[in-house]
Structure formats: structure tokens, C-alpha cells
């Protein structure tokens, strides 16, 4: 019974870490990545569609993203959507292809990004601790209902804390890896 609570808690914490990784993918580093454009929606004949559903995205060079719309008439709406996304990118088109050149990040901007990364990591840690609290509450409820003994509760609480510590350490690893990536010139 305690194993169910702990495994449910662990999978919930794993989802929190996955969510953090997805959030980090959206953060601009010094390198071009199509994931920078994941959140951009384009007006495609009256319907808001993700950018990757109206154009082919590619990264031909470390600081360049190219977009090749499937329909040449889509170039102006795609450029407008990119400008409205406030990513600090200026689209340039040659009639068939849109190029996005990523300017190099300044030292000051890199430090701002690292601050943002640390905030995301702290939010993830808070979420993990909240999941821990819910799991401990569930275990105490089981003990109150006499479904587990007090000794089982103490053992399970220790296991919950161990799982929590390992997930917090994984969050720190993810942060450290992304921080290195951002600070790399």
C-alpha cells in the first residue's frame, strides 16, 4: 500500500522534471534550435496553427533557423507571428525561405537567462516538495485508518524523503547542464 503511494509520487515528480526540461528547451541559448519556435502560432487560413504545421523548420548553421513555408502566401503571416512572439528575432525572406539569424548573446543577457533558469528550477523544486507533502498526508491517512502501522508510516516517510531528495538532485543536474549551455560562448 505504501509502495503505491511512493510510486505514484515518484511518477508525478518525474513529470515535473520533464516539464522543467520542456521549459528549458524554450529558453534561447547561444545556439539555434527549432524548439525556440514551438509556441508560435500562425494564422493559417483563419485557423491558428503551430509553425511546424505550416512550414519546414531547419537549422543549417549554429546561429540560423530557416523556415520553408509549404505555401508561399504564408510568408507574411509567418513573419508577423515571429515578430509578435517577441523573441528578439528578425525574419528575413527571399520569397521562398525565411531566415532567422540569432544574434550572439551578451554576457549580461546570459546572466539574465541563468536567473530565469534558476527560477524555473526553484519552481520545480517547490512542486516536488508539494508532491512530497501530499504523499506524506496520504500515508498518514492510511495510518489513521489503521491500514498501515506506525512503523510502516515511519519507513514510508523515510522512503518518500529519499525519493524527494533524488528528484531535487536531478533538478539541480538539469539546471547545471542548461546553465553550462547558456554560459558557453
Swiss-Prot record:
Molecular function per GO: ribosomal large subunit binding
Cellular localisation: Cytoplasm
Main location: cytoplasm
Pfam families, A to Z: RRF (PF01765)
Tree of life domain: Bacteria
InterPro entries, per the entry: Ribosome_recyc_fac (IPR002661), Ribosome_recyc_fac_dom (IPR023584), RRF_sf (IPR036191)
Protein keywords: Cytoplasm, Protein biosynthesis
Gene Ontology CC entries for this record: cytosol
GO aspect biological process, one term: cytoplasmic translational termination
SUPFAM superfamilies in alphabetical order: Ribosome recycling factor, RRF
NCBIfam families: frr
Family of this protein: Belongs to the RRF family.
Alphabetized HAMAP family for the sequence: RRF
Free-text function comment from the UniProt entry: Responsible for the release of ribosomes from messenger RNA at the termination of protein biosynthesis. May increase the efficiency of translation by recycling ribosomes from one round of translation to another.
Protein name: Ribosome-recycling factor
Amino acid at each position: 500500500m505504501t509502495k503505491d503511494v511512493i510510486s505514484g509520487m515518484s511518477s508525478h515528480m518525474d513529470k515535473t522534471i520533464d516539464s522543467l526540461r520542456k521549459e528549458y528547451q524554450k529558453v534561447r541559448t547561444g545556439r539555434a534550435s527549432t524548439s525556440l519556435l514551438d509556441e508560435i502560432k500562425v494564422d493559417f487560413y483563419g485557423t491558428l496553427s503551430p509553425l511546424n504545421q505550416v512550414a519546414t523548420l531547419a537549422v543549417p548553421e549554429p546561429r540560423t533557423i530557416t523556415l520553408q513555408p509549404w505555401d508561399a502566401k504564408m510568408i507574411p503571416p509567418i513573419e508577423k507571428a515571429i515578430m509578435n512572439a517577441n523573441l528578439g528575432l528578425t525574419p528575413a525572406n527571399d520569397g521562398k525561405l525565411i531566415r532567422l539569424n540569432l544574434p550572439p548573446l551578451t554576457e549580461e543577457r546570459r546572466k539574465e537567462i541563468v536567473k530565469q533558469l534558476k527560477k524555473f528550477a526553484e519552481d520545480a523544486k517547490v512542486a516536488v516538495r508539494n508532491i512530497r507533502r501530499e504523499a506524506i498526508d496520504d500515508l498518514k491517512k492510511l495510518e489513521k485508518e489503521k491500514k498501515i502501522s506506525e512503523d510502516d508510516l515511519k519507513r514510508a516517510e523515510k522512503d518518500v524523503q529519499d525519493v524527494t531528495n533524488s528528484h531535487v538532485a536531478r533538478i539541480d543536474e538539469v539546471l547545471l547542464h542548461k546553465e553550462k549551455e547558456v554560459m558557453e560562448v
